[in-house]
Amino acid sequence: MSSSGAKDKPELQFPFLQDEETVATLQECKTLFILRGLPGSGKSTLARFIVDKYRDGTKMVSADSYKITPGARGSFSEEYKQLDEDLAACCRRDFRVLVLDDTNHERERLEQLFELADQYQYQVVLVEPKTAWRLDCAQLKEKNQWQLSADDLKKLKPGLEKDFLPLYFGWFLTKKSSAALWKTGQTFLEELGNHKAFKKELRHFVSGDEPREKIELVTYFGKRPPGVLHCTTKFCDYGKAAGAEEYAQQDVVKKSYCKAFTLTISALFVTPKTTGARVELSEQQLALWPNDVDKLSPSDNLPRGSRAHITLGCAGDVEAVQTGIDLLEIVRQEKGGSRGEEVGELSRGKLYSLGSGRWMLSLAKKMEVRAIFTGYYGKGKAVPIRSGRKGGSFQSCTII
């Protein structure tokens, strides 16, 4: 099937099919495309276009191949067990693009798939056909291969009428960009830990009855994000968070879903609680940035995008949400006229002491990282991270 024919079809207008930068960027990621939709709505056609576009390193797993009739999963427990085993085997083989073709109309089923994606460090993209008849049961009755009646189709419809919202939306870095930023962050921690100005301020990082001459910051920030790094835009809590539905329904969010972006990193920072990278958002990226997240208090009037960051690590008992709060406190201080004291030069730029155990490395040359805008749909809890390589299994990590 030629993907050139996709350009003229409105139902195939997705960035991952039409935007060449996105196609190239997805080649550097591990992505699980989960198709959702009623039988006859065009899922299988869409799945074939995705496979055709990405070719090598791509695998499709289709419920049709297991003779699963769309509907309640209970009647096909053995078939689904086999499908899931085959899907996990594909994950272990590190296919860059996996396509799962099924109705996926039940939340419980989706949650199983999200957990699998977490275990093998795949980013998830939910895809629904854009065909005009996708929710028209009268038309679907004629189009579906299973000869399901309109009443059968109506029973499946409620789970597909509303968008499934993630825990949060954000830009997820490619494996290559993630590794490069991670390495830069680790070097910063090592250099900062050895710097004489930092050693004078150790009291912010150790308790008073613990005399120390040095601290290993790489170990101190031991709570690390597994897999690829990300920059959160909107925390949705699966639709329960304030403003989540409104954010997800914005045209710019829908059009940008699974689209490639290049993010600019201007600085790295350390506080007694977190370490992260400061992200400078372009005008195009600010269009995806919520209006209400750049405040610590209602009276704050900080520049839009002030909170944009990538968490690189947290101290033991600290949650990842703290990284953005720490950055906002730094920006608030800057807005008040204090950029801190320049205390030296590290390999990547100038080092500033901001007081209270806070440090900023202003990068002499800003870093550019490639990322995909999508959602994180997992539980955000510790999961056993599995490697695609034989015998490779990592310890449980917390998604942050």
Swiss-Prot record:
Pfam families: AAA_33 (PF13671), CNPase (PF05881)
Keyword Membrane applies: yes
Temperature-dependent activity: Optimum temperature is 37 degrees Celsius.
Effect of pH on activity: Optimum pH is 6 (in the presence of both hexadecyltrimethylammonium bromide and serum albumin).
UniProt topology in membrane: Lipid-anchor
GO terms, molecular function: 2',3'-cyclic-nucleotide 3'-phosphodiesterase activity; RNA binding
Residue list for modification Cysteine methyl ester: C397
Keyword line: Hydrolase, Lipoprotein, Membrane, Methylation, Phosphoprotein, Prenylation, RNA-binding
SUPFAM superfamilies, per the entry: LigT-like, P-loop containing nucleoside triphosphate hydrolases
Propeptide: 398-400
PANTHER family in the cross-refs: 2',3'-CYCLIC-NUCLEOTIDE 3'-PHOSPHODIESTERASE (PTHR10156:SF0)
Similarity field: Belongs to the 2H phosphoesterase superfamily. CNPase family.
This protein's name: 2',3'-cyclic-nucleotide 3'-phosphodiesterase
Species in which this protein is naturally found: Bos taurus
Organism lineage string: Eukaryota, Metazoa, Chordata, Craniata, Vertebrata
